[in-house]
Amino acid sequence: MPKHLPADSVGIVEQHSLHFDEPLPLDCGRSLPAYDLVYETYGELNAERSNAILICHALSGSHHAAGYHSEEDRKPGWWEACVGPGKPIDTDRFYVVCCNNLGGCHGSTGPSSINPETHRPYGPDFPLVTVRDWVHSQARLADALGIERWAAVVGGSLGGMQAIQWAIDYPDRLGHVVAIAVAPRLSAQNIGFNEVARQAILTDPEFHGGRYYEHHTVPRRGLALARMLGHITYLSDDAMRDKFGRDLRADGGRYKFNFDVEFEVESYLRYQGRSFVDRFDANTYLLMTKVLDYFDPAAEYDHDLSAALAHVQARFLLISFSSDWRFPPERSREIVRALEDNQKPISYLEVETSQGHDAFLKPIPVYTEAFRAYMQGIAREVGA
């Protein structure tokens, strides 16, 4: 952490935890009899309780969206670019909540948690959950925090899918949806990427059928490979060319003619894989990819997205990025058209950038200024 915190940082933050004893029915037909949700908050809830914002995290995210946990922290929260005083999600005006979703590995109940029935980690016995399950658990968190209505539910990628599901399932409990770099469902190609990632983990000899905790080991190679594959899909060809090109690491630009790391891009991907293993759980990664695969709100409406969104009451802001080939702009435009079919209020921005899918995490001026302007409008609307 820098010696002096930036003026636009929320600073040192604390995580909180709530325990829920009421069983949570799940889409898979099972239920969680009890569970914990870990979350962080930034800013102050106003007297009218009208300025609350829910941030939903993506696959590898957590409740730690902004700020630092201690002075020893090397990096701030995952959305530091957009959350803080004067930033798009302005913590001088909004009360911001971000929770680690069920099935996660950062404190909320998930595969690495102890199963009260067996007194061992859940591992593969943890139920597969859906975006809708997450939204229902988040609604219970809102109840516990005394928040009847969110000023907005905001998220990028998988987080944006949760925001859309909120508008469908709880239309009267949010004023706005901000969904960034999102899609109404995964394509066959995206499901294919997820399956390759899962196979990398499932076939690692150290996976042990998901019970690697009991073997005091971790499927490091499989999880690292899954992350390397995922990371390629989060970048664009242009971004990788600009960052790495065909640069070699050493040896005066000469090939080694072996399978050691030679290209800078190889070194980068291996580093991303190794560092990810130290902060993420393989069973959670498997679960998160399935959550993505299963998201398809139109499926219950004869695959008619317009019908799925017919009863939403929230206003929408959708933002896509030109070089995002994982969830390209056309996928956001599908949602725009479905909302327009229902004469719902919608704002849409397509940002020209070479940053790929991960652009939603970056401080790209056109993106952050549009995001900030929209959120300022919400602040005025709720008197924040």
From Swiss-Prot:
Residues 51-361 form the AB hydrolase-1 domain. Keywords: Acyltransferase, Amino-acid biosynthesis, Cytoplasm, Methionine biosynthesis, Transferase. The active site is at S157, D324, H357. Substrate binds at R227, D358. InterPro entries: AB_hydrolase_1 (IPR000073), AB_hydrolase_fold (IPR029058), HAT_MetX-like (IPR008220). GO terms for biological process: homoserine metabolic process; methionine biosynthetic process. Its main location: cytoplasm. The keyword Acyltransferase applies. It is found in: Cytoplasm. It holds the Pfam family Abhydrolase_1. The record marks R326 as: Important for acyl-CoA specificity. GO terms for cellular component: cytoplasm. Pathway: Amino-acid biosynthesis; L-methionine biosynthesis via de novo pathway; O-succinyl-L-homoserine from L-homoserine: step 1/1. The keyword Amino-acid biosynthesis applies. It catalyses: L-homoserine + succinyl-CoA = O-succinyl-L-homoserine + CoA. Its EC number is 2.3.1.46. GO terms for molecular function: homoserine O-acetyltransferase activity; homoserine O-succinyltransferase activity. Homodimer. Belongs to the AB hydrolase superfamily. MetX family. Transfers a succinyl group from succinyl-CoA to L-homoserine, forming succinyl-L-homoserine. This is Homoserine O-succinyltransferase. It comes from Alkalilimnicola ehrlichii (strain ATCC BAA-1101 / DSM 17681 / MLHE-1). The lineage of its organism: Bacteria, Pseudomonadati, Pseudomonadota, Gammaproteobacteria, Chromatiales. The gene is metXS.
